[in-house]
Amino acid sequence: MSFKKYLSIALTLLVVLATFAGCAAPAAAPAAAPAAEEAAPTEAAPAEAAPAEGGETIKIGVTMLFDDRWLTSMREAMQAYGEGQEGVEVIFVDSKEDVAVQLGQVENFITQGVNAIVVVPANTDATDPMTQAAVDAGIPLVYVNRKPANLPEGIAYVGSDSIDAGIFQMEWIAEKLGGKGNVVIMNGNLSQEAAQQRTAGVKQVAANFPEIAITKEQTANWSRDEGLALMENWLSTGDPIDAVAANNDEMAIGAIQAIEAAGKLGQIIVGGVDASADALAEMDAGRLNVTVFQNAVGQGEGGIATAIALARGEPVEQIVWIPYELVTP
């Protein structure tokens, strides 16, 4: 694959994030603006609660899933960024992808008196109770990576515009298919905005090609093992499959393993999202055809930088987009 291109992407985004460190607030939204139908990002109102006084440690509580390879990379970036900031302590708890557990963790952070809370939501359609709890307590709240269905004024979000991942992925697949073929979609967790919007992006592009059919669609819950099992099931039907559009790399790798076991490696195009280390290795080996880079470091650092700025009472952009980039061999 073109490592120069990939490194250029990463370095560009890290330069953007360097602005966070310099001014203690997130960088301006990149050129890839939100869709026209969305209102332009507004400034998140500073928290009513007084920020940590001079000399006091700013404590940031983070609740997110631990058992996920990509999110682990993002968590490590959050931790490293926090450790690099003087007078900042970042506390992590495992949400276990459970809505009730996560709400309890947010409530515990409030009781502990943290200065800001960062959430990677277990369910993007069920964030209102967490939002209300933080607002009632006057504690700044930042959602990261998974954009809530409802993002009220004063609550910040740092992440990527999920529909773009599906669009970039499917545009490349459609071109390689010559505008015709049977495509299957592996969904992530459908209670989460990322899976919903990445899938919407794939379908949006496919709709422009009358001879491309979405023949199968099912969740594999972001899991390599579930992706393997689902692909085995699809292959066992004998139905023609020309391409797999997976919502993330882990499911794509599982699909590749099933395709290889069936003796069909090289006969079916496989696409993922994240550009994880494992995915790039699969691409170098000629097994993964396309992925879309999602910057774990950029999102992680941006989320903590935004939380720090809000804890200090500084204005920030309500939405900070960290753009996706296509990655091909």
Can you annotate each of these PLM segments?
Residues 18-22:
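C-terminal motif of bacterial Sec signal peptides marking the signal peptidase cleavage site
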